[in-house]
A protein has these predicted regions:
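Hydrophobic, small-residue-rich alpha-helical packing segments that form membrane-like cores
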Residues: 1-2
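Acidic, glycine-enriched catalytic cores built around paired aspartates
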Residues: 6-311
Length: 311
């Protein structure tokens, strides 16, 4: 949990893609805000651990911790309960699940991030426990409980048991200081941050050059995919949808013209629905064409920005 708290933006970056931008926050997919769901029982255990006495523990406190707090953690069994499908990172009885990875994505990327941040956290935990034992003359279990208490306090804001789809969670996430990077370009910035580069370098995963190269490749892949989708969408809109709409509109116009020939001035009564459809089709054609033009212009701007960034 502490590892996810410290590197939530990197986890979000690891699952970023053009298609996942459309999926996150809808269609039974978790939101772009990274949070941890552990359930009410484990939350209660962590809340009690948070109140552990600072420093040395009395024999009574140790007994209470081992019997009444740690002892309450249930036997880990295969989970068959509701798993809060709105949570991107959930504990489901015997494991944590990262649910935000796209269906076509290679899971090696997110797994690299998860393994690295957990390894980093375990390393830091060992260093901090040893330092506390040496500086405060504490026993190992006392030092462990003291460090755990600080970790639980520090990472509390990443824990969320509610509905991740609701607007209320977005507001609450802002109050907690959690990131909400809804697009891939925003999310990928974390991959070349000083924090990420230092992490990979310290853990011997990737060098600074390798990290920056991967970021550039992922950004280029995103741009290429969006470019292709934009061009295909523009082609479909202007060369297929609009011509088909005009063809149908012409059929309606011929129908209205025929009704006018038959009914004279009363044709508007009989052709009311057709005339309404003709007007709506004209409105939609204009909307499709103007939005396609706007999309092309934005695509040109994106090309220019990408060229400047590459330079």
């Amino acid at each position: 949990i502490k590892a996810v708290h410290d590197y939530e933006e990197l986890i979000r970056a690891s699952i970023a893609s053009a298609s996942n931008d459309h999926r996150l926050g809808a269609n039974e997919a978790p939101p772009a805000i990274i949070s941890v769901f552990i359930g009410s029982q484990l939350s209660a255990v962590l809340d009690e651990l948070e109140n552990v006495t600072k420093g040395k523990l009395s024999p009574e406190e140790k007994t209470d911790l081992k019997l009444n707090i740690v002892g309450k953690i249930p036997e880990i069994l295969l989970d068959n309960t509701d798993r809060n499908r709105t949570s991107p990172f959930a504990f489901t009885g015997n494991k944590f699940e990262l649910r935000a990875v796209g269906s076509w994505a290679n899971c090696a990327g997110p797994m690299t991030v998860l393994n690295t941040i957990v390894a980093k956290q375990l390393k830091d935990f060992k260093i901090e426990v040893d330092a506390l034992i040496e500086s405060k003359n504490l026993k190992k279990d006392e030092a462990i409980f003291n460090i755990l208490r600080e970790y639980i306090k520090a990472s509390k804001k990443i824990r969320f048991e509610g509905n991740g789809y609701g607007e209320e969670w977005e507001i609450e996430a802002v109050k907690r200081g959690l990131s909400n990077n809804k697009t891939t370009p925003e999310a990928l910035k974390e991959k070349k941050s000083k924090k990420t580069i230092a992490l990979y370098d310290e853990m011997g995963v990737m060098s600074k050059i390798e990290t920056e190269a991967r970021h550039e490749i992922e950004l280029e892949e995103y741009i290429l995919r969006v470019q292709i989708e934009g061009r295909v969408l523009g082609d479909i809109a202007r060369n297929h949808i609009i011509p088909t709409a005009i063809k149908y509109q012409n059929t309606l116009i011929e129908n209205v013209s025929g009704l006018k020939n038959i009914f004279g001035n009363e044709f508007k009564i009989h052709a009311k629905e057709q005339i309404d459809l003709i007007e709506k089709i004209s409105m939609h054609i204009a909307g499709i064409n103007s939005k396609t033009t706007a999309m092309i212009e934005e695509r040109k701007k994106a090309n220019t920005m990408h060229g400047q960034e590459a330079a």
